[in-house]
Amino acid sequence: GLAGSTCAKVLSGAGHPFVLCEASGRPGGRAVSDRTSDGFVLDRGFQVLLDSYPAARRHLDFTALGGGRFRAGAMFVGGGRPRCLENPLRRPPALFGALRAEVIPSGDLLRLLRLVTKSLGPGGAEETFSTGAMLRRYGFSETFFTRFARPFFGGVLLDPELRTSAEVFFGYLRRFVTGRALIPARGIGALAEQLVAGIPQGMVRYGMRAEKLVFAEGGVCGVRFANGVFLAGDEVILAVDEPAACRLLGSGRPRAALATAVHYFAADRPFYRGAWLCLPPRREESPVLHAALVSNAAPSLAPRGAHLWSVTVLPGHPRAADAELVRAEVASWFGENPRLMRPLAFIEVPYAVPEQLPGFRRRPSPWGV
């Protein structure tokens, strides 16, 4: 995955001998991209890189990744004519447009500015509250929840009920305010490919799924893999998800996982211009959280003359996999014929991120470290 690939890059740069073992046949873990036979690039879920992360700035070459960035703002759809609202912190005159649009009540816009200010300063964690409870404490209206909080931050957190710790919310808010969402030209899988590109040949091995840690004199002395190979080492770094860590260490129980799911559609023409994320009002009967013509941000994700839709849906919704329903809803936002959207794939990611409920940092580690 990205953590292991970054670790290997750092070790390689420092001149330390190591072997990076990857379970699959390529780097990236869940952050990989697949190219279809007709030239579309599909990520495992809607994935973007926020260029404000310090670690990303240290270890990645954004220019070499290519692609493009989404507009700082959102397109509000599903309630009449689509309306594009820009982030007023990046373009202050946009505040007047947001007030005129009346998509989000003016009082909520001012409350949101307060939260942004709080996120940029010290002590903005509020770790004892869920995101939803924190927003209600600040007095946000139900309209704000329906039109923005659930479709946008519910999608970011993979938690439309907003049960995730407010500490996590503030962390994401700070990154969105200070940076932009980037999609690499070759999809999100380009991140890990770039990280391992400079590692000497032979120091990365694929098809190596860790099966068991081998202990000696109270410490880990090596790893046995599913293919029968045993590798000894002075130090072993586990860069795996929680279920794998608990299994290998033989202790603890992983936190519940949050899932995600995405539909991809091809289109011969775009329904809108600009690199916008589309936010429909959150409705219980609909599985759709948000959508985007990702090829508007990174044209190389689709073959010449074609366009690529990414539509994020609630994985637990009874109609999440219904491509006909999903494309009909998306097309209705723009008054278009749903047949103009050709289904390409439906991708589910059962373990996207671990659940991060209020107080998650204070809970003892399941491994005692």
Briefly describe each language-model feature range.
Residues 4:
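N-terminal Rossmann-fold NAD(P) dinucleotide-binding loop
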Residues 12-37:
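Glycine-rich FAD pyrophosphate-binding loop
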Residues 53-57, 61-162, 176-178:
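Mobile amphipathic helical/loop "lid" adjacent to a hydrophobic cofactor/ligand pocket
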Residues 169-227, 231:
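Helical element adjacent to the flavin cofactor pocket in flavoenzyme catalytic cores
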Residues 299-303, 347-369:
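FAD-binding beta-loop-beta segment adjacent to the flavin cofactor pocket
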